[in-house]
A protein has these predicted regions:
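Membrane-proximal, glycine/serine-rich, low-complexity loop/turn segments characteristic
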Residues: 20-34, 44, 56, 73-76, ...
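C-terminal beta-barrel architecture of Gram-negative outer-membrane proteins
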Residues: 831-899
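Short, acidic Ser/Thr/Gly-rich low-complexity loop/linker segments typical of extracellular
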Residues: 60-76
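Outer membrane beta-barrel strand-and-loop segments of large Gram-negative receptors
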Residues: 385, 516-518, 561-563, 666-668, ...
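A short, solvent-exposed loop/turn motif at the edges and junctions
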Residues: 59-64, 86, 90-102
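Outer-membrane beta-barrel translocator domains and adjoining extracellular loop/strand segments
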Residues: 226-228, 265-268, 296, 305-313, ...
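Signature of Gram-negative outer-membrane beta-barrel scaffolds
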Residues: 532-635, 843
Length: 969
């Protein structure tokens, strides 16, 4: 009996124990299970659903946002995966009084019913006036553009938004200028975004996620820490401030486009491209520690809109610039993929990393008309047609590591790597005629080339502050760059002079390498509360090597076109400055001394030549920097400094360039570094009562030993040129004035005015008569330079013994624009008119003086309906006066587009250049010639696209997709 009793007791204890376990598991499940919360957001008066309302949860007694979403088009809200517990529900929408209420969530699905928001008239009026009127603000060294004040469509990208903003310019390569000054980098929320690739942000970030664009003229991280300013320490940063709903969570879009191009451009400037396509993907995720952005795109045509206008360029005659001009225009097939990560996960550090791949395949074509000036003779006229293809692949890897706590110690490490491969082919056909139209010469030349290169560069900086005394600092920065390239090319040509025809076929193997190590050591000794004495020493050593081995068509070596050169460049820069800093105001002044040594060693035809060995150049300049910010929205900046520039590698290469047999050049191993004095003045004023803004800027440059080309023609009309230093300094002065003001009670009409003027005076060297050409069959570089240049100082050239005279060129360019923009809630219209006048005056040959006029009229219309339709049109009309025959014809560009938003999707149809009149025109003016050129363009085409917005960009977003993306972080 006792045994039975014990057995029963044990059984009961066992059952009881299991029962307790079951109860405990049930409690744990209840406490940790997730539920769904749903609600409906409506207007309290009309009971209409309110889309895009911000809805988020805070745990009771905490300000942390644990769940965040937006209401969809029907005003419905679903918040998944909410742990049971007590929360405060927050519902907010601009123009309405926020709703807040505490709840205790326990059920599997909590239906909170309808949340009705009450309108707040004061907020609505203030928001509408501020959004439209206060478009640009000035706060000390920062220009703040309010994105809401510039009406762009729902499909617009960041590039489209920036082009609407006063003073902003966006180049074809993605470079951005503000009031004529280039932006050094683009950041998002103060974080690095794809480092030195501005197009990544411009072409991939949607405009509607941007709240403000801040253009900040600031000191870099090293200078801000040390309190020491130098000529290289300031940078202009464009920071994108996102709207609140995009600062946390995931968002993105995917787009596919297809289209058709019916025509072929006239006069050989076209290809057989008819089928068009495009696609892009952008995914971005943000949380408290990480910012991750993934982008991918590819296209052979951009979306219609912004088809461009004439491009007008007036430049000095520079070898590299002329090569760059030949690449303008054309039809590109491009692709890009990349990832950018900003993270705070490394303890005590902020880190940024990006990797990107870029592909480009371009078909280009150019038609040129050139009038060449000959002193004492009638001009020569050259007409040419150039076509070509180029393909490139580039991989870029960047990393940046910054110390967070910079109160005492600063550390920055920024390495970068580049891998590049490229290939190109070109064909140039041209003829030269005299004033009577009789042909003098002609050529048909082709070239193909390929190259591969690698570059590793970086920056390491460290410093300490408050060393035994407040504000005393010591900072060291080291920069490095190592690169290597290999390539090959083939050139074939037929050149005729009357009845004489000269064929040529050459093959080249090329190689290049470069090394650069530089650094800056700075020390600040403070005295008093605001003053300090700074000493800065800057040094840079750079070595460049170039090898070029030439071979004839039969494979035998051609020593006349082969060469080897090495350039060693050393720069030492010392600066002593007095500095005054109080809050945002500063006044720096001092003296800087630049010492440069430029040594060139070359080998041609088995002979070695050395120049510049042990020769030092000394340049002195003052250093001034004044920055003042007033309390009434005023900002003043003044700076003066000097900088030294090394000659480009192609300018010192001692070998003939005969890729165009009618345009032959060689380098100059005796070139010396140039030195530029730069002065800038600017004043900005923002009236916070009228929301008006005015900006005035003035930039002046004086360049000593500037590099230009000395050119001449031979008896057959072939042009030759060699780079030389100028004896007299070149000067330029550029001024900008812009004004913008909204008018009316509701600030719906905005008026704007801008004027830009440029005055320049430069030196050129022209032959006083026709000269003998270079011996293309047996070119002896040393013998040629002895006759053309003389000794290392250019005794024969500058004295005029080799037949050249100095010519002074004066140029003026004035560009004026007036604009009126009217905006309603869903409609906007912009009218703009522009006039540009360019004049050139030449001392050596006044008959070559020029006077050109360009006129442009622009109309932009945008209308959005309540049902998600968007209609947009852009019309531009251009007129010309004073150009050669065939280049004065007016033309009109007309773009149309229509789109419809359907929940998370947007479908659109656009037609570019409806009248098929688009053209790309460049205009080059200098002392030697005037050239106009047309380049290949797309012409009329149509594109249909489908875009899907997901995450926070989709008001009816899918919770499963949102959660899956969130788990990627």
């Amino acid at each position: 009996m006792k045994r039975i009793t014990l057995a029963l007791l044990g059984l009961l204890l066992t059952v009881s124990a299991h029962a307790q376990v079951v109860v405990m598991d049930s409690d744990m499940f209840e406490r940790n299970r997730n539920i769904r919360v749903k609600l409906l957001v409506q207007d309290a008066r009309s009971e209409e659903p309110l889309p895009f309302a911000t809805v988020y949860l805070n745990p009771q007694g905490d300000t942390t946002i644990t769940h965040f979403t937006l209401s969809d088009q029907k005003g419905e809200v679903l918040i998944p995966d909410v742990p049971v517990g007590r929360y405060r529900l927050n519902v907010e929408l601009i123009g309405y009084t926020p709703f807040r209420k505490d709840y205790n969530f326990r059920n599997y699905e909590e239906d909170l019913g309808t949340i009705k928001l009450e309108e707040n008239p004061e907020i609505i009026d203030a928001a509408s006036i501020t959004a439209v009127g206060n478009a640009v603000e000035v706060r000390q060294d920062t220009l703040i553009y309010n994105a809401a004040a510039f009406h762009v469509g729902d499909n617009a990208m960041l590039e489209d938004l920036i082009k609407k903003m006063p003073g902003m310019e966006v180049g074809d390569d993605g470079t951005v200028k503000v009031n004529g000054e280039p932006v050094d980098k683009i950041t998002v929320g103060g974080k690095t975004f794809f480092f030195n690739d501005p197009s990544a942000a411009l072409k991939n970030l949607p405009a509607k996620i941007v709240d403000k664009i801040k253009v900040i003229d600031q000191e870099n991280k090293e200078a801000a820490f040390s309190g020491i300013a130098s000529q290289d320490s300031r940078e202009k940063v464009m920071d994108l401030e996102l709207k609140e709903e995009y600062k946390q969570g995931w968002f993105g879009n995917a787009k596919l486009s297809g289209g058709y191009r019916p025509g072929v451009n006239e006069e050989g400037l076209g290809d057989d491209r008819h089928a068009l396509y495009g696609g892009n993907l952008m995914v971005s995720g943000y949380n408290e520690k990480d910012q991750l952005t993934l982008i991918a795109n590819g296209q052979n045509a951009s979306d219609p809109g912004g088809s461009g206008s004439s491009v007008f360029i007036s430049v000095e005659d520079d070898l590299e610039m002329l090569d760059a001009l030949s690449l303008l225009g054309g039809m590109k097939t491009t692709a890009m993929a990349g990832a950018n990560l900003n993270s705070d996960r490394i303890k005590g550090m902020e880190s940024s990393a990006s990797v990107s791949y870029n592909f480009s395949d371009q078909i280009s074509g150019t038609r040129t008309a050139r009038e060449s000036m000959l002193v004492g003779e009638n001009p020569l006229f050259t007409n040419g047609l150039t076509s070509g293809t180029s393909r490139s692949n580039r991989v870029s890897v960047n990393f940046e590591l910054n110390r967070k706590d910079t109160r005492k110690i600063n550390f920055v490490f920024r390495p970068a790597f580049r891998f590049n491969s490229s290939a190109s082919t070109s064909r140039n056909q041209s003829t030269t005629t005299d004033v009577l139209g009789e042909e003098i010469n002609g050529t048909d030349a082709g070239k193909s080339s390929s190259s591969r290169s690698f570059q590793a560069s970086g920056r390491i900086s460290g410093g300490v502050r408050d060393i035994g005394k407040e504000r005393r600092s010591l900072n060291l920065t080291v920069n490095y760059n190592f690169n290597r390239s290999l390539g090959e090319s083939r050139e074939d040509s037929r050149t005729w002079y009357g009845a004489t025809v000269t064929p040529r076929n050459l093959h080249y193997d090329t190689g290049g390498s470069g090394k650069m190590v530089g650094g800056e050591l700075s020390y600040l000794e403070p005295f008093g509360q605001y003053w300090g004495l700074a000493a800065i020493v800057n040094a840079r050593w750079q070595q460049r090597g170039n090898d070029k081995a030439a071979f004839n068509a039969d494979g035998s070596a051609n020593d006349y076109y082969s060469s080897r050169s090495r350039n060693d460049y050393l720069l030492l820069n010392q600066s002593l400055q007095m500095q005054y800093r109080k809050e945002s105001n500063q006044f720096y002044f001092g003296l800087q001394h630049a010492q440069t040594r430029n040594e060139v060693r070359s080998r041609t035809l088995g002979r070695d030549t050395e120049t510049g060995i042990g020769e030092w150049l000394h340049d002195w300049s003052p250093y001034v920097s004044i920055r003042w910010s007033g309390k009434e929205g005023q900002s003043v900046r003044v700076s003066y400094q000097g900088s030294s520039s090394q000659p480009a590698a192609v300018q010192i290469h001692p070998v003939l360039d005969i890729s165009n047999p009618l345009e032959i050049s060689t380098g100059n191993i005796y070139l010396r570094p140039s030195f530029r004095h730069s002065l800038s003045l600017s004043w900005d004023f923002n009236n916070r009562k009228t929301f008006s803004n005015i900006s005035v800027s003035l930039f002046g440059d004086m360049t000593q030993r500037g590099i230009v080309s000395a050119s001449w023609f031979d008896a057959d009309g072939v042009r030759y040129f060699v780079p030389v230093n100028t004896r007299k300094p070149s000067t330029s002065l550029t001024g900008y004035v812009s004004w913008r003001r909204p008018v009316g009670e509701k600030k719906r009409l905005t008026l704007g005015f801008g004027i830009q003027g440029n005055l320049s005076s430069s030196t050129h060297y022209q032959a006083t008569s026709r000269q003998s050409g270079m011996d293309l069959l047996a070119f002896d570089y040393n013998a040629f330079m002895a006759d053309f240049w003389g000794d290392a100082g250019g005794s024969r050239f500058y004295s005029g013994q080799s037949g050249f005279s100095e010519s002074r060129t004066s140029q003026s360019d004035i560009y004026t624009t007036m604009q009126a923009a009217y905006r309603l809630d869903r409609f906007s219209v912009t009218l703009r008119s522009a006039i540009e006048n360019e004049r050139s005056r030449y001392s050596l040959d006044p008959t070559a003086n020029t006077d050109y006029w360009r006129f442009g009229q622009y109309l932009d219309l945008l209308y959005e309906t309540l049902h998600g339709w968007e209609f947009k049109t852009e019309v531009s009309f251009f007129q010309f006066r004073g150009y050669p025959a065939g280049f004065n014809e007016p033309y009109c560009l007309w773009d149309l587009s229509v789109s419809k938003n359907i929940n998370a999707f947007t479908v659109s149809l656009g037609i570019s250049d409806l009248l098929n009149q688009q053209r790309m025109q460049q205009h080059t003016v200098n002392a030697e010639y005037i050239e106009d050129r047309y380049s290949l363009v797309m012409g009329r085409y149509a594109m249909f696209s489908l875009k899907w917005s997901f995450g926070k960009m989709n008001p009816a977003k899918n919770a499963r997709v949102q959660n899956a993306m969130y788990n990627m972080l």
